[in-house]
């Protein structure tokens, strides 16, 4: 529909008409006494100038000036004729122009509504032809929204790829930062780059593990075996938290309306804790307890120990238990969290041109295994490939995972120590079989000189012999410090792994030193065992330590990529960031959000000050105070300060010359300080 441009207001210039340009009267000043405001402003400015004259001019000059009579009237008239008119006309014009802008905006919005207006005759005609179900643009609008959404997704994905390539070019290498961006870096549990065993010069293997906590998931994930009572209690708990948040918002609004100070983050947390008892309590046996206000104790007892599946022999569609379970199942609370995660990762892989040939979804175990190729034989796979494992772990599973991990580590320690003992026994026997060579290593040499050292050195000084001193260091790893509760609850096993790795290296070196170029059966057997332990230990060390995980979603990815090509690495980087953005809420540090100023900018030396003059207190100041005066000195006033300090040096004498670093204003040191100040 065509629109007509109507005049919004007359563009009139007049000194007295309200709403005119340049007028001293405004429509916005309907309830204000303009003359009283002007008189108050002029009176204040006149008194300021008179007070300034009274303080600056001598008394005889003030007596000659008629301050109380003619001068005040002249000042008053000057302000009244100039300052008042300029200031008042500017304010009036600004207010009127703002009204015109608002009025024009309202008119434009009204024209938009008129353009969409449909005459009554056309609406009746459409109803007679078909009806609203036929002439409905809802589906077309949904299609347009989907089209724009896909377009925006492709644009964003292209921008992410460009950003990833740019970062890799700037780095000139591939590192952990190429995968996960800064806002998601906290979710990384382990990321390791290592050369491929078959082609170490051209191919790299990457291990990446990401842990998304329960509290960070957009849609919570529950195990398939979770009871219906647990799901309902979780819903009730979320309802209580929402109610507490609304109550806190209401309290905030009341404080703002009353003009009081807003609550701090700590105060909000304490208030939330106080409100918990208003919604629930710990009395499980009382049917009238607050915890049973939303759902009665009788219903909770009916659904106790009710899980995802019901025994067909006891199933009845009309029972209360079955209907409550049906309501929960219709909302799909049990499965929607994990299903959303699977849909997200698979759709992102499809749109990112990262296809896959093998997928296995363990629905009841909440685990997804996805591989780019179905074959698992490394010798038949290309150098560009990936596989990922998506699994949800609760606290009970993590406890068992940690137990198994620790048992496996102790088993490795037992096997490595056993091979160490066998190799050491063989080494000692090989030394005993050498009749001609009495000295093979440092221990043999120490035995030869043992009596001589005891007789000539230790007995004279009274010190104990080396063999009588308790040997704490095993010469393999440094002494391990005592464990605290933190180490016992969070086993890293870094010390044990480093010690085993060190033992494997020492055993290989000792085998080479014992046999050189000889390969008897003993050497071959021990080298085979050593190679097996090394390969298995590397596989074990490549896994994620469950002591570092927390209950939530675990994304474990293994990538093999060509070093020069890096196609899979770049593609998986975009997939990971988009996946984390879709299912994780992330976290925001409230301390940093409320911290409005950096500490480095809050310093006493930010407010620069000039060097002080030569007063009596300045004479006895220390050298540190004089140095701070030199630092705070400005080059613009360097000459004037130096001129004033000439008299100070003449009065103080030699003592002031020694302590006053500021006094060297005209020398070379003063010029250097001026350069530093600039």
From Swiss-Prot:
Coiled-coil region(s): 24-49, 290-311, 397-417, 522-540
Annotated region described as Disordered, given as residue ranges: 1-24, 656-678
Basic residues bias (residue ranges): 667-678
Subcellular location, record wording: Cytoplasm
Superkingdom of this protein's organism: Bacteria
InterPro entries: Cyto_Filament_Comp (IPR053574)
GO cellular component terms, semicolon-separated: cytoplasm
Principal location class: cytoplasm
Keywords: Coiled coil, Cytoplasm
Function: Component of the cytoplasmic filaments that run the length of the organism just underneath the cytoplasmic membrane.
UniProt-recorded name of the protein: Cytoplasmic filament protein A
Annotated organism of origin: Treponema pallidum (strain Nichols)
Species classification: Bacteria, Pseudomonadati, Spirochaetota, Spirochaetia, Spirochaetales
């Amino acid at each position: 529909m065509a629109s007509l441009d109507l005049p919004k207001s007359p563009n009139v210039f007049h000194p007295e008409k309200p709403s005119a340009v340049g007028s001293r009267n405004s429509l916005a000043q309907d309830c204000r006494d303009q003359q009283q405001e002007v008189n108050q402003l002029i009176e204040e400015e006149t008194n300021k100038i008179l007070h300034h004259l009274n303080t600056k001019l001598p008394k005889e000059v003030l007596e000659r000036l008629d301050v109380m009579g003619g001068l005040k009237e002249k000042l008053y008239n000057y302000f009244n004729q100039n300052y008042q008119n300029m200031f008042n006309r500017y304010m009036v014009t600004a207010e009127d122009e703002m009204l015109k802008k608002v009025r024009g905006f309202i008119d434009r919005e009204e024209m938009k509504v008129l353009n969409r207006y449909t005459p009554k005759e056309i609406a009746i005609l459409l109803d007679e032809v078909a009806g609203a179900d036929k002439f409905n643009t809802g589906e077309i609008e949904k299609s347009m929204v989907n089209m724009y959404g896909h377009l925006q997704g492709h644009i964003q994905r292209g921008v992410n790829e460009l950003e990833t390539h740019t970062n890799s070019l700037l780095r000139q290498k591939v590192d952990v930062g190429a995968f996960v961006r800064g806002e998601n870096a906290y979710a990384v549990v382990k990321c390791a780059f290592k050369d491929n065993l078959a082609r170490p010069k051209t191919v790299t293997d990457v291990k990446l593990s990401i842990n998304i906590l329960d509290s960070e998931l957009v849609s919570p994930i529950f195990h398939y075996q979770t009871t219906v009572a647990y799901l309902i209690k979780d819903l009730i708990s979320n309802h209580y938290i929402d109610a507490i948040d609304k109550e806190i918002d209401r309290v905030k609004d009341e404080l703002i309306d009353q003009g009081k100070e807003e609550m701090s983050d700590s105060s909000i947390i304490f208030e939330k804790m106080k409100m918990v008892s208003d919604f629930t309590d710990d009395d499980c046996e009382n049917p009238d307890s607050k915890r049973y206000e939303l759902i009665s104790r009788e219903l909770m007892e009916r659904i106790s120990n009710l899980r995802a599946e019901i025994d067909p022999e006891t199933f009845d569609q009309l029972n209360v238990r079955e209907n409550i379970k049906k309501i929960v199942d219709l909302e799909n609370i049990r499965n929607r969290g994990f299903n959303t995660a699977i849909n997200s990762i698979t759709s992102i892989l499809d749109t990112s041109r990262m296809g896959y040939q093998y997928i296995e979804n363990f629905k009841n175990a909440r685990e997804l295994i996805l591989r780019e190729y179905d074959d698992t034989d490394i010798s038949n796979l290309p150098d560009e490939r990936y596989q990922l494992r998506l699994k949800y772990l609760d606290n009970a599973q993590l406890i068992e995972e940690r137990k198994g991990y620790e048992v496996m580590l102790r088993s490795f320690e037992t096997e490595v120590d056993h091979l160490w003992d066998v190799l050491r026994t063989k080494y000692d026997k090989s030394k005993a079989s050498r009749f001609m060579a009495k000295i093979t290593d440092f221990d043999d040499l120490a035995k030869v000189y043992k009596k001589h050292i005891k007789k000539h050195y230790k007995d004279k000084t009274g010190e104990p012999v080396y063999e009588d001193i308790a040997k704490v260091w095993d010469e393999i790893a440094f002494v391990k410090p005592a464990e605290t509760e933190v180490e016992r609850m969070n086993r890293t096993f870094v010390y044990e792994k480093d010690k085993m790795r060190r033992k494997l290296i020492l055993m290989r070196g000792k085998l080479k030193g014992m046999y050189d170029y000889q390969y008897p059966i003993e050497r071959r057997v021990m080298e085979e065992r050593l190679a097996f332990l090394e390969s298995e230990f590397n596989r074990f060390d490549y896994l994620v330590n469950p002591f570092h995980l927390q209950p939530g979603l675990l994304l474990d990815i293994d990538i093999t990529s060509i070093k020069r090509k890096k196609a899979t690495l770049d593609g998986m980087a975009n997939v990971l960031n988009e996946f984390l953005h879709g299912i994780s809420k992330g976290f925001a540090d409230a301390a940093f959000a409320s911290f409005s100023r950096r500490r480095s900018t809050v310093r006493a030396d930010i407010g620069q000050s000039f060097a002080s003059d030569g007063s009596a207190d300045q004479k006895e100041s220390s050298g540190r105070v004089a140095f701070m005066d030199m630092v705070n000195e400005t080059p613009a006033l360097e000459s004037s300060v130096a001129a004033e300090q000439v008299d100070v040096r003449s009065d103080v004498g030699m003592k002031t010359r020694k302590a006053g670093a500021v006094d060297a204003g005209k020398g070379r040191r003063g010029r250097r300080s001026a350069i530093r100040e600039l």
